[in-house]
């Protein structure tokens, strides 16, 4: 088993882990991200991306923000939650959502230079992971956290 030293160990390469890794690497902080699987998200998961998350992507660079928008459903196409008896049944009600109702559009427009959108995790996760690795994050797939011990010199983590 190899001994590897890093300033920060990030466990998980989902959106939070990969964004953390990308931001740390952007600031020159050595880090390693591990993922117990050998792949990134490949099944339906989270998909609504709020304005604050888009601001974090903008902090990573306009190229990252622009790539996210390229894969996302724009906010103005996310406007309704529809309630039906079934997929082909009678519509029971409709509610404007995701900041598209007339009374909330202005609030969203003035609160941030970014826009809420529908960006599935299957697109977001690879974008963040690619950004992190391209900026210096060391990544290890098929590595699972087992334990850690903290002492005066730091933290020793065992992965398998």
Predicted region positions:
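N-terminal Rossmann-like FAD-binding beta1-loop-alpha1 element of flavoenzymes
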Residues: 3-33
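Phosphate-binding active sites in nucleotide-utilizing proteins
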Residues: 14, 40, 133, 147-152
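Residue-level detector of anion-binding/catalytic polar loops
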Residues: 30, 63, 138
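Active-site-adjacent segment of FAD-dependent monooxygenases/related oxidoreductases
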Residues: 42-133
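A conserved short coil-to-beta-strand element within the FAD-binding core of flavoproteins
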Residues: 141-158
């Amino acid at each position: 088993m190899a001994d590897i030293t890093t300033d920060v160990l990030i466990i998980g390469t989902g959106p939070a882990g990969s964004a953390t890794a990308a931001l740390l690497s952007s600031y020159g902080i050595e880090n390693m991200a591990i993922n117990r699987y050998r792949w990134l998200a490949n099944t339906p998961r989270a998909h609504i991306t709020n304005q604050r998350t888009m601001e974090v992507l903008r902090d990573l660079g306009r190229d990252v923000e622009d790539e996210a928008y390229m894969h996302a459903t724009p906010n103005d196409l996310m406007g309704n939650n529809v309630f039906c008896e079934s997929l082909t049944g009678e519509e029971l009600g409709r509610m404007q959502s995701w900041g598209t109702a007339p009374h909330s559009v202005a609030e969203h427009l003035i609160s941030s230079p970014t826009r809420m959108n529908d960006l599935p995790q299957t697109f977001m996760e690879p974008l963040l992971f690619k950004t992190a690795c391209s900026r210096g994050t060391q990544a290890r797939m098929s590595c699972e956290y087992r334990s850690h011990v903290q002492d005066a010199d730091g933290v020793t983590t065992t992965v398998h």
